[in-house]
Swiss-Prot record:
Gene assigned in the entry: HBB
Subunit structure: Heterotetramer of two alpha chains and two beta chains.
GO terms for biological process, alphabetical: hydrogen peroxide catabolic process
Protein name: Hemoglobin subunit beta
InterPro entries for this protein: Globin (IPR000971), Globin-like_sf (IPR009050), Globin/Proto (IPR012292), Hemoglobin_b (IPR002337), Hemoglobin_oxygen_transport (IPR050056)
Amino acid sequence: VHWSAEEKQLITGLWGKVDVAEVGGATLGKLLVVFPWTQRFFAHFGNLSSANAIICNPVVKAHGKKVLTSFGEAIKHLDSIKETFAKLSELHCEKLHVDPENFRLLGNILIIVLAGHHGKEFTPSTHAAFQKLVRAVAHSLARVYH
């Protein structure tokens, strides 16, 4: 993936303001609510019986933070995203058997959450840069599947 200087600045500039715990928990929580079939990977997370139970679940929040911390690694290594996610791709494919479509869904939910948390700062240009990023991350995570 080729990144312009402007795209890199937009991504790193906004990411520096992201509360990884809050945004990560909200992103994973929304994924589990909006796409309930994804819950099958998280049955061991406890109460996932309702939208409120999922959003308030401390294990969902903690794992969301972990997911977004990992996503932050992509931002630190924009020029080597595939290499950055090689081991996670292998884990999700060979051990966890996660449908790679879920990576795209999670990225799209992240875009929505970022837009909600950052309002006017999440300009169309910032949105475009982050859309490119989540697409690159999803593709990298799905790499072992191909």
